[in-house]
Amino acid sequence: MGYMAETIYTTRDINRAIRAQMKKGAATRIEGLTGQDNIAVGLEGDVKITIIGEAGDFFGALNCGTTLLLKGNSGRFLGDTMSSGKIVVEGKASDGAGANLHGGEIIIKGNAGGRIGVGMKGGMIIIDGDVGDELGVNLFGGDILITGNAGKNVGRSMTGGNIFVNGKIKSLGENAKALKPGKSDKLKLTNFLTKQNLMGEFKFKKVISKREIPLDTIKSAFGMSIKKGLANEEPEDI
């Protein structure tokens, strides 16, 4: 395993060290991260990188196939526009984790901020903790799983994908509804939880799109006055 125990202070130096180890095909361990932005951005290749310390914004953005383990907290936009690979955070994450995610997995073993999975199109986000407001806003696809509580406007303007919340939901956003998970959902959840060694008694609610096209989009495009009762199903009490 490539190992760098000395403290490195600049984003440029850290990323150079990571790429140098990746060229050798070696697993890499970096220590001394102190909040630098844009660490491990745009990496390609089936290599595992362990980073110890506090990451700034855009950690692991544009990831394509690399496994990143962060032993510490992350700033905003963790894994932004990631296409494949895996990011595990053994700590908390700030706002916007998994924004515009296309594929791969993001696992946060702690609480996270707001707007998790905004604009997400595929892949998986698992958060073993609570999240802030606007979870899954503008969600197009993929799965988001929260073992704790969620804030306001969950699933606002979502048109696809699934959001699973085990705890309390402060409020649903426009175009979102909450249902009880079906048999296939329960099997999927069991597989997700078992894979991450998350054990316990879970009672998830499933949040999905109420309409195929968000109400705001229809109003804006056609100048129509549409009543909220357009959908046949109403969200269950949460």
Regions found by a protein language model. Give the residues of each.
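Short loop/beta submotifs within extracellular cysteine-rich repeat domains
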Residues: 57-58, 76-77, 95-96, 114-116, ...
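Functionally constrained cores in energy, signaling, and assembly domains
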Residues: 10-11, 28, 44, 55, ...
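A mid-sequence interfacial segment
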Residues: 86, 96-97, 102-105
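Intrinsically disordered, low-complexity terminal regions
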Residues: 1-39, 109, 128, 134, ...
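The right-handed parallel beta-helix/beta-solenoid scaffold, focusing on the short coil/turn
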Residues: 26-28, 37-39, 45-47, 57-59, ...
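Feature marks extracellular polysaccharide-active and adherence modules
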Residues: 31-33, 42, 52-54, 61-62, ...
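Extracellular/periplasmic carbohydrate-active domains that bind, remodel
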Residues: 1-2, 11, 15, 34-36, ...
